[in-house]
């Protein structure tokens, strides 16, 4: 049963991590620099599944080391290298998440493939520094029961404690502190968010955007071509004005209680919804607010606008409601989408890291106890 379950886990690990590498390398949407961490982590897991797990299974089933003595030393070094690399990769990913959340604008400009590759190289160097000492200094290999060859890790207390701290306990402590900090930042932002939005809306409502005609120094106006409700008044449409409804805008029919606007005779070009692009950008920064009613032009009847909307009277007697017009609104929505994606990705990584810590903790706890109190803190062999 143990052999069947372990074999299934080996195949599942190789197949799943190979799919991760293939997806990141072939999908254009996954070619972000930070996803290189996932590629390197998947490579470390494949290394564990192919070069370590099969020999560990054979050693466990046979009860002794069946293979060459030289391969035992290489096998132990590879086991420490890959396992340490996998754990330190999770630590590096958590730090990347923290920097992306706490210093988003500054860090995103520095998050280049070259920088990420340098961090990955540092991770592998740390893992190599922890795995190389057993190859250089053999140390005490412990007794060989029944004269059969055994393949065990270095039994020196100094190496057990140093490798356990460097491979697991230090990265684990860093990950816990980092994700605690991320949680506090997210909690503070969520608590501050409604107040900040309320303040911006209050400030925006104090700055009316009248729809009045005039020169460029006056409040923006509805254009003459858009102010003529031709079909409502029964007049013919001016030539060349058909089909000029702005794209990407929702269109609703003009209510009957809205009076038609006469031709103002002005041909100046204005922004969509009768306001200039500058005023549109200012309005987007403050959030979508209601525009107070004001005269459309000198001598024209008042144009009452529904609260919470921006309108555009077209030639066909319709009202066009804008959907996030302006560069500021687009940037705001992109930023909000990016933050939502970052939060979701951070939550998924927190779950993955938590599961990995729980899986590794029993081994490193028992391994460290063997060095701290070797005679009174023995762990039963059947535990693993």
Swiss-Prot record:
It comes from the Eukaryota. Its main location: membrane. GO terms for cellular component: cell surface; plasma membrane. The chain crosses the membrane at residues 1-25, 37-62, 73-95, 118-140, 157-180, 349-372, 382-384. Keywords: Cell membrane, Disulfide bond, G-protein coupled receptor, Membrane, Receptor, Transducer, Transmembrane, Transmembrane helix. It holds the Pfam family 7tm_1. GO terms for molecular function: alpha2-adrenergic receptor activity; epinephrine binding. PROSITE patterns: G_PROTEIN_RECEP_F1_1, G_PROTEIN_RECEP_F1_2. This is Alpha-2B adrenergic receptor. The gene is ADRA2B.
């Amino acid at each position: 049963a143990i052999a069947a379950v372990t074999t299934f886990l080996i195949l599942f690990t190789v197949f799943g991590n190979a799919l991760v590498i293939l997806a990141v390398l072939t999908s254009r949407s996954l070619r972000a620099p930070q996803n290189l961490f996932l590629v390197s982590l998947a490579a470390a897991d494949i290394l564990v599944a192919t070069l370590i797990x099969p020999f560990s299974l054979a050693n466990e089933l046979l009860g002794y080391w069946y293979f060459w003595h030289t391969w035992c030393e290489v096998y132990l070094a590879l086991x420490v290298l890959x396992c340490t690399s996998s754990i330190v990769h999770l630590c590096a990913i958590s730090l990347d998440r923290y920097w992306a959340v706490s210093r988003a604008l500054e860090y995103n400009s520095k998050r280049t493939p070259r920088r990420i590759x340098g961090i990955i190289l540092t991770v592998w160097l740390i893992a190599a520094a922890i795995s190389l000492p057993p190859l250089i200094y053999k140390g005490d290999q412990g007794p060989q029961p029944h004269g059969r060859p055994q393949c065990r890790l270095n039994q020196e207390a100094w190496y057990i404690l140093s490798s356990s701290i460097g491979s697991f306990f230090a990265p684990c402590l860093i990950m816990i502190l980092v994700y605690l900090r991320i949680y506090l930042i997210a909690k503070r932002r969520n608590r501050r968010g409604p107040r900040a939005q309320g303040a911006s809306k209050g400030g925006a409502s104090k700055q009316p955007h009248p729809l009045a005609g005039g020169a460029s120094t006056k409040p923006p106006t509805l254009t003459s071509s858009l102010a003529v409700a031709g079909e409502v008044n029964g007049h013919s449409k001016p030539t060349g004005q058909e089909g000029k409804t702005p794209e990407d805008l929702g269109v609703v029919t003009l209510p009957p209680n809205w009076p038609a606007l006469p031709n103002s005779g002005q041909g100046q070009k204005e922004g969509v919804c009768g306001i200039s692009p500058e005023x549109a950008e200012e309005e987007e920064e403050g959030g979508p607010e209601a525009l107070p009613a004001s005269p459309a032009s000198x001598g024209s009847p008042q144009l009452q606008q529904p609260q919470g909307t921006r309108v555009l009277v077209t030639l066909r007697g319709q009202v066009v409601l804008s959907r996030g017009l302006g560069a500021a609104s687009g940037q705001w929505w992109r930023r909000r989408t990016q933050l939502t994606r970052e939060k979701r990705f951070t939550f998924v990584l927190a779950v993955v890291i938590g599961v990995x810590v729980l899986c590794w903790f029993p081994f490193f706890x028992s391994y460290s106890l063997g060095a701290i109190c070797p005679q009174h803190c023995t762990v039963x062999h059947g535990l693993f």
